[in-house]
Protein backbone atom coordinates (compact mmCIF):
# COMPACT_ATOMS: atom_id res chain seq x y z
CA UNK A 1 0.00 0.00 0.00
CA UNK A 2 1.48 3.32 -1.12
CA UNK A 3 -0.50 6.46 -0.31
CA UNK A 4 -0.11 10.00 -1.62
CA UNK A 5 -1.01 12.82 0.77
CA UNK A 6 -1.20 16.36 -0.64
CA UNK A 7 -0.24 18.92 2.00
CA UNK A 8 -2.86 21.63 1.77
CA UNK A 9 -0.69 24.16 3.62
CA UNK A 10 1.00 24.68 0.24
CA UNK A 11 -2.27 25.38 -1.54
CA UNK A 12 -3.91 28.67 -2.48
CA UNK A 13 -6.40 29.30 0.31
CA UNK A 14 -8.54 31.51 -1.92
CA UNK A 15 -9.48 28.42 -3.91
CA UNK A 16 -8.36 25.56 -1.66
CA UNK A 17 -11.65 23.70 -2.08
CA UNK A 18 -11.20 23.53 -5.84
CA UNK A 19 -7.57 22.52 -5.45
CA UNK A 20 -8.43 19.74 -3.03
CA UNK A 21 -10.98 18.38 -5.49
CA UNK A 22 -8.30 18.44 -8.20
CA UNK A 23 -6.01 16.29 -6.04
CA UNK A 24 -8.84 13.86 -5.38
CA UNK A 25 -9.53 13.51 -9.10
CA UNK A 26 -5.80 12.95 -9.61
CA UNK A 27 -5.75 9.99 -7.23
CA UNK A 28 -4.77 11.43 -3.84
CA UNK A 29 -5.39 9.09 -0.92
CA UNK A 30 -5.18 11.34 2.16
CA UNK A 31 -5.19 15.09 2.86
CA UNK A 32 -2.31 16.27 5.05
CA UNK A 33 -3.22 19.16 7.35
CA UNK A 34 -0.40 20.98 9.16
CA UNK A 35 -1.16 22.69 12.46
CA UNK A 36 1.41 25.13 13.90
CA UNK A 37 1.09 27.30 16.98
CA UNK A 38 4.07 29.65 16.66
CA UNK A 39 5.67 28.16 19.77
CA UNK A 40 6.77 24.62 18.97
CA UNK A 41 7.61 25.75 15.43
CA UNK A 42 8.20 29.31 14.13
CA UNK A 43 4.98 29.68 12.18
CA UNK A 44 1.22 29.85 12.71
CA UNK A 45 -1.38 28.08 10.60
CA UNK A 46 -5.08 27.24 10.75
CA UNK A 47 -6.63 25.18 13.54
CA UNK A 48 -9.52 22.80 14.05
CA UNK A 49 -12.24 25.22 12.96
CA UNK A 50 -10.83 25.48 9.43
CA UNK A 51 -10.35 21.70 9.39
CA UNK A 52 -14.07 21.25 10.07
CA UNK A 53 -14.90 23.26 6.92
CA UNK A 54 -12.45 21.21 4.86
CA UNK A 55 -14.03 18.04 6.23
CA UNK A 56 -17.40 19.10 4.79
CA UNK A 57 -15.89 19.49 1.32
CA UNK A 58 -13.58 16.49 1.12
CA UNK A 59 -14.30 12.77 1.29
CA UNK A 60 -10.69 11.67 1.85
CA UNK A 61 -9.23 10.92 5.28
CA UNK A 62 -7.57 13.96 6.89
CA UNK A 63 -4.16 13.54 8.51
CA UNK A 64 -3.63 16.29 11.11
CA UNK A 65 0.05 16.89 11.92
CA UNK A 66 0.09 18.74 15.25
CA UNK A 67 3.19 20.93 15.60
CA UNK A 68 1.93 22.47 18.81
CA UNK A 69 2.60 22.65 22.53
CA UNK A 70 0.34 20.61 24.81
CA UNK A 71 -1.26 18.57 22.01
CA UNK A 72 -3.34 16.41 24.38
CA UNK A 73 -5.48 19.45 25.19
CA UNK A 74 -6.49 19.92 21.55
CA UNK A 75 -6.60 16.37 20.17
CA UNK A 76 -10.33 15.88 20.99
CA UNK A 77 -11.13 19.11 19.12
CA UNK A 78 -9.33 17.94 15.99
CA UNK A 79 -11.05 14.55 16.06
CA UNK A 80 -14.41 16.27 16.54
CA UNK A 81 -13.59 18.55 13.58
CA UNK A 82 -13.03 15.55 11.34
CA UNK A 83 -9.39 14.45 11.56
CA UNK A 84 -9.01 10.71 10.89
CA UNK A 85 -5.26 10.53 11.53
CA UNK A 86 -3.44 12.59 14.17
CA UNK A 87 0.31 12.75 14.71
CA UNK A 88 2.29 14.37 17.53
CA UNK A 89 6.00 15.08 17.93
CA UNK A 90 8.26 12.98 20.11
CA UNK A 91 10.32 16.12 20.77
CA UNK A 92 7.69 17.78 22.96
CA UNK A 93 5.86 14.78 24.36
CA UNK A 94 7.13 13.16 27.54
CA UNK A 95 4.14 10.80 27.76
CA UNK A 96 3.88 9.56 24.19
CA UNK A 97 2.15 6.30 25.12
CA UNK A 98 -0.65 8.19 26.88
CA UNK A 99 -1.07 10.56 23.93
CA UNK A 100 -1.20 7.76 21.36
CA UNK A 101 -3.76 5.92 23.48
CA UNK A 102 -5.88 9.07 23.70
CA UNK A 103 -5.92 9.42 19.92
CA UNK A 104 -6.90 5.78 19.47
CA UNK A 105 -9.64 5.96 22.09
CA UNK A 106 -11.15 8.86 20.16
CA UNK A 107 -11.28 6.68 17.03
CA UNK A 108 -8.41 8.11 15.00
CA UNK A 109 -5.15 6.60 13.79
CA UNK A 110 -2.28 7.60 16.07
CA UNK A 111 1.08 8.75 14.75
CA UNK A 112 4.40 9.85 16.19
CA UNK A 113 6.58 12.42 14.40
CA UNK A 114 10.37 12.65 14.47
CA UNK A 115 12.36 15.69 13.34
CA UNK A 116 15.53 15.49 11.18
CA UNK A 117 17.84 16.23 14.11
CA UNK A 118 16.30 13.67 16.48
CA UNK A 119 17.75 10.18 16.77
CA UNK A 120 15.41 7.45 15.57
CA UNK A 121 16.09 5.61 18.81
CA UNK A 122 13.87 8.22 20.50
CA UNK A 123 10.76 6.71 18.90
CA UNK A 124 11.64 3.03 19.29
CA UNK A 125 9.29 2.48 22.23
CA UNK A 126 6.51 4.46 20.53
CA UNK A 127 6.68 2.10 17.54
CA UNK A 128 5.00 -0.58 19.65
CA UNK A 129 1.85 1.56 19.94
CA UNK A 130 1.76 3.85 16.89
CA UNK A 131 -0.33 3.28 13.79
CA UNK A 132 2.19 5.31 11.80
CA UNK A 133 5.46 7.20 12.09
CA UNK A 134 5.96 10.51 10.33
CA UNK A 135 9.60 11.10 9.40
CA UNK A 136 10.32 14.76 8.71
CA UNK A 137 12.71 15.29 5.82
CA UNK A 138 12.86 19.06 6.43
CA UNK A 139 12.82 21.02 9.66
CA UNK A 140 9.14 21.69 10.38
CA UNK A 141 7.59 25.12 10.17
CA UNK A 142 7.51 26.20 6.53
CA UNK A 143 6.42 24.79 3.19
CA UNK A 144 8.72 24.58 0.18
CA UNK A 145 11.98 23.62 1.91
CA UNK A 146 14.74 21.54 0.34
CA UNK A 147 14.79 17.80 1.02
CA UNK A 148 17.46 16.69 3.52
CA UNK A 149 19.36 13.90 1.72
CA UNK A 150 20.23 12.08 4.94
CA UNK A 151 16.51 11.27 5.16
CA UNK A 152 16.91 8.40 2.69
CA UNK A 153 19.22 6.51 5.03
CA UNK A 154 16.99 7.37 7.98
CA UNK A 155 14.05 5.88 6.07
CA UNK A 156 15.94 2.63 5.57
CA UNK A 157 16.86 2.47 9.26
CA UNK A 158 13.30 3.27 10.30
CA UNK A 159 11.93 0.56 8.03
CA UNK A 160 14.22 -2.00 9.68
CA UNK A 161 13.02 -0.86 13.11
CA UNK A 162 9.37 -0.97 12.03
CA UNK A 163 9.66 -4.42 10.46
CA UNK A 164 11.19 -5.74 13.67
CA UNK A 165 8.89 -4.07 16.19
CA UNK A 166 5.51 -3.42 14.56
CA UNK A 167 5.16 -4.45 10.89
CA UNK A 168 1.65 -3.00 10.63
CA UNK A 169 2.87 0.51 11.46
CA UNK A 170 2.99 2.75 8.38
CA UNK A 171 5.95 4.99 7.55
CA UNK A 172 5.09 8.47 6.34
CA UNK A 173 7.57 11.07 5.07
CA UNK A 174 7.08 14.81 4.75
CA UNK A 175 9.27 17.59 3.38
CA UNK A 176 10.83 18.51 0.06
CA UNK A 177 9.30 15.65 -1.92
CA UNK A 178 9.20 16.31 -5.67
CA UNK A 179 9.15 14.38 -8.94
CA UNK A 180 12.90 13.80 -8.74
CA UNK A 181 12.90 11.99 -5.38
CA UNK A 182 9.42 10.54 -4.77
CA UNK A 183 10.33 7.13 -6.23
CA UNK A 184 13.50 7.01 -4.13
CA UNK A 185 11.68 7.60 -0.84
CA UNK A 186 9.15 4.89 -1.72
CA UNK A 187 11.94 2.40 -2.49
CA UNK A 188 13.63 3.34 0.80
CA UNK A 189 10.53 2.39 2.78
CA UNK A 190 7.91 5.14 2.76
CA UNK A 191 4.29 3.95 2.72
CA UNK A 192 2.73 7.42 2.81
CA UNK A 193 4.30 10.38 0.99
CA UNK A 194 3.32 13.95 1.81
CA UNK A 195 3.77 16.44 -1.04
CA UNK A 196 3.11 20.17 -0.76
CA UNK A 197 4.54 22.60 -3.30
CA UNK A 198 5.39 19.62 -5.52
CA UNK A 199 1.65 19.35 -6.16
CA UNK A 200 0.14 22.76 -5.47
CA UNK A 201 2.92 24.61 -7.27
CA UNK A 202 1.95 22.96 -10.57
CA UNK A 203 -0.25 24.65 -13.16
CA UNK A 204 -2.37 21.51 -13.49
CA UNK A 205 -2.82 20.12 -9.98
CA UNK A 206 -4.90 17.14 -11.06
CA UNK A 207 -2.36 16.03 -13.66
CA UNK A 208 0.55 16.56 -11.27
CA UNK A 209 -1.15 14.50 -8.56
CA UNK A 210 -1.76 11.71 -11.05
CA UNK A 211 1.87 11.83 -12.22
CA UNK A 212 3.29 11.62 -8.70
CA UNK A 213 0.99 8.74 -7.78
CA UNK A 214 2.13 6.91 -10.91
CA UNK A 215 5.78 7.44 -9.97
CA UNK A 216 5.08 5.98 -6.52
CA UNK A 217 3.37 2.89 -7.90
CA UNK A 218 6.08 2.38 -10.52
CA UNK A 219 8.72 2.46 -7.78
CA UNK A 220 7.00 -0.44 -6.03
CA UNK A 221 6.90 -2.59 -9.16
CA UNK A 222 10.61 -2.14 -9.97
Curated annotation (Swiss-Prot):
UniProtKB keywords: Carbohydrate metabolism, Isomerase, Metal-binding
Family: Belongs to the ribulose-phosphate 3-epimerase family.
InterPro entries linked: Aldolase_TIM, Ribul_P_3_epim, Ribul_P_3_epim-like, RibuloseP-bd_barrel
Record: residues binding substrate: 7, 65, 141-144, 174-176, 196-197
Protein name: Ribulose-phosphate 3-epimerase
Highest rank taxon of the organism: Bacteria
Annotated function: Catalyzes the reversible epimerization of D-ribulose 5-phosphate to D-xylulose 5-phosphate.
Record Gene3D superfamilies: Aldolase class I
Pfam families: Ribul_P_3_epim (PF00834)
Pathway the protein acts in: Carbohydrate degradation
Residue numbers binding a divalent metal cation: 32, 34, 65, 174
Cofactor: record remark: Binds 1 divalent metal cation per subunit.
Species: Aquifex aeolicus (strain VF5)
Keyword Isomerase on entry: yes
